[in-house]
């Protein structure tokens, strides 16, 4: 799933020239979806495909109730220091995810989609807090490994076209990254408050480059993963 950040009444970051983050994220998100549609590996879906407002709750509810193999949230960064520039990648913190898992178990939610094997374990052990927590902790560990490995592929492609603001993966307690049934990451595609990056981010050519870099990384990662799984069977 591709999540173009912000939208509608929520413009996201706005620079001194009036460029709104929501417009950049939507354009890159649509371009990425179009690229992914050309591959049999993917079935891409957008959280929004126009300038509409989609609340964080609605985005999270969709993830809860549907099978989403991976979520990529597209954003553009901002800073009061106009010289700051570059792309970065973020995933959720351990503390935030463990809190989400504990809340799920405590509230006994039943409307969350899980893979069949995990769903069966949870259903059979409804009242076993420790077993459910162990299963979900293990799933989170697997998700985190996937996020870390995929981030390496994306960094490899992004650094060909843009300076990296942070050369390592970053962690943040963000709601969009904290669904317990979906691996996810947030990509900051550059700073709209930086004159040079803002100038590039406005253009179709540069938006295409960003979308293509993410697409190539996703294709390479999932192809390698598929080949690895085939070798191990």
Curated annotation (Swiss-Prot):
Top-level taxon in the UniProt lineage: Bacteria
Catalytic reactions on record: Hydrolyzes the link between N-acetylmuramoyl residues and L-amino acid residues in certain cell-wall glycopeptides
SMART domains (alphabetical): Ami_3 (SM00646)
GO biological processes: cell wall organization; peptidoglycan catabolic process
Main location as per UniProt: secreted
Ranges in a coiled coil: none
Function summary: Cell-wall hydrolase involved in septum cleavage during cell division.
Protein name per Swiss-Prot or TrEMBL: Putative N-acetylmuramoyl-L-alanine amidase
Gene that this polypeptide is encoded by: amiB
């Amino acid at each position: 799933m591709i999540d173009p950040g912000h939208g509608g009444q929520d413009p996201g970051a706005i620079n001194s020239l009036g460029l709104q983050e929501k417009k950049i994220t939507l354009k890159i998100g649509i371009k990425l979806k179009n690229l992914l549609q050309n591959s049999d590996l993917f079935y891409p879906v957008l959280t929004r495909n126009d300038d509409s407002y989609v609340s964080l709750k609605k985005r999270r509810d969709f993830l809860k109730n549907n099978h989403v193999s991976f979520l990529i949230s597209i954003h553009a960064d901002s800073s009061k220091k106009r010289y700051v520039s570059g792309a970065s990648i973020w995933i959720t913190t351990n503390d935030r995810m463990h809190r989400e898992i504990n809340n799920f178990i405590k509230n006994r939610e039943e409307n969350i989609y899980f893979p069949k094997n995990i769903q069966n374990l949870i259903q059979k052990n409804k009242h076993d807090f420790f077993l459910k927590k162990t299963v979900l902790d293990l799933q989170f560990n697997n998700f985190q490994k996937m996020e870390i490995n995929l981030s390496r592929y994306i960094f490899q492609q992004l650094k060909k076209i843009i300076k990296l603001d942070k050369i390592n993966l970053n962690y943040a307690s963000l709601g969009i990254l904290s669904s317990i049934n979906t691996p996810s990451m947030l990509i900051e595609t550059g700073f709209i408050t930086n004159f040079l990056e803002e100038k590039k981010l406005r253009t179709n050519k540069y938006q295409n480059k960003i979308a293509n870099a993410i697409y190539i990384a996703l294709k390479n990662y999932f192809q390698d993963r598929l080949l690895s799984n085939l070798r191990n069977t």
